[in-house]
From Swiss-Prot:
It catalyses: heme b(in) + ATP + H2O = heme b(out) + ADP + phosphate + H(+). Belongs to the ABC transporter superfamily. CcmA exporter (TC 3.A.1.107) family. The gene is ccmA. GO terms for cellular component: plasma membrane. It comes from Pseudomonas fluorescens (strain ATCC BAA-477 / NRRL B-23932 / Pf-5). ATP binds at residues 38-45. Residues 6-206 form the ABC transporter domain. Part of the ABC transporter complex CcmAB involved in the biogenesis of c-type cytochromes; once thought to export heme, this seems not to be the case, but its exact role is uncertain. Responsible for energy coupling to the transport system. InterPro entries: AAA+_ATPase, ABC_transporter-like_ATP-bd, ABC_transporter-like_CS, ABC_transptr_haem_export_CcmA, P-loop_NTPase. It is a peripheral membrane protein. This is Cytochrome c biogenesis ATP-binding export protein CcmA.
Length: 211
């Protein structure tokens, strides 16, 4: 059996004195796409944040290459890309400046690569304009352009289709599936029904793990 890149072991999460889920198990290997589903308040975003190392579990642990996630910050940055529900961009900066800044935190990217990534998400001609002049959908595309740069193998995405039009949704679906088919991994939440799923797709319903 292939060793997982990321593994959740007996994971439990409590928020505001309420146990959202417990005893959760998850293994991620190349080619996997995992959709986290469940009713509102079931802990979908909390689970993503736990897997991304942005929160600590109430009990259990998250392992990266078999070792505790919290002890491997540099290794985590090399292996994982997180895009949250909010666009997470600086509105006074341009799309190019935002991507340059985000990439500089982990792996700097050439200007040509950044422009190609922005073109891939339909932002050709908007590279140098302040992001506060862009629509919500365009701002979302700025964040998603990171997926078109040289990026880590594991993508953790919270509602990535938010504010995208029909064409943008179809393009992103294809890109996510292609990433998995090339050996990458995706964990995501979405209220959108996926039309394009790789062979490694599976759904985890947090209702099964509710306390």
């Amino acid at each position: 059996m292939t060793s997982p890149l990321l593994e959740a072991v007996a994971l439990a999460c409590e928020r505001d004195w309420r146990m959202l889920f417990e005893h959760l198990e998850l293994r991620l290997t190349g080619g996997d796409m995992v959709q986290i589903s469940g009713p509102n308040g079931s802990g979908k975003t909390s689970l993503l944040r736990l897997l991304a190392g942005l929160m600590q579990p109430t009990s259990g642990q998250v392992l990266l290459n078999g070792q505790p996630l919290h002890a491997q910050r540099a290794e985590l940055a090399r292996n994982l890309l997180w895009i949250g529900h909010a666009a997470g961009i600086k509105e006074l900066l341009s799309p190019e400046e935002n991507l340059s800044w985000l990439c500089a935190l982990h792996q700097p990217a050439r200007r040509e690569a950044i422009w190609q990534a922005l073109a891939a998400v339909g932002l050709r001609g908007f590279e140098d304009v302040p992001c506060h002049t862009l629509s919500a959908g365009q701002q979302r595309r700025v964040a998603l352009a990171r997926l078109y740069l040289d990026s880590p193998p594991l993508w953790i995405l919270d509602e990535p289709f938010t504010a995208l039009d029909k064409q943008g949704v179809a393009q992103l679906e294809e890109h996510l599936a292609g990433h998995c088919e090339r050996g990458g991994m995706v964990v995501l939440t979405t209220h959108h029904s996926l039309a394009r799923m790789p062979s490694g797709y599976r759904d985890i319903d947090l209702g099964r793990w509710a306390a």
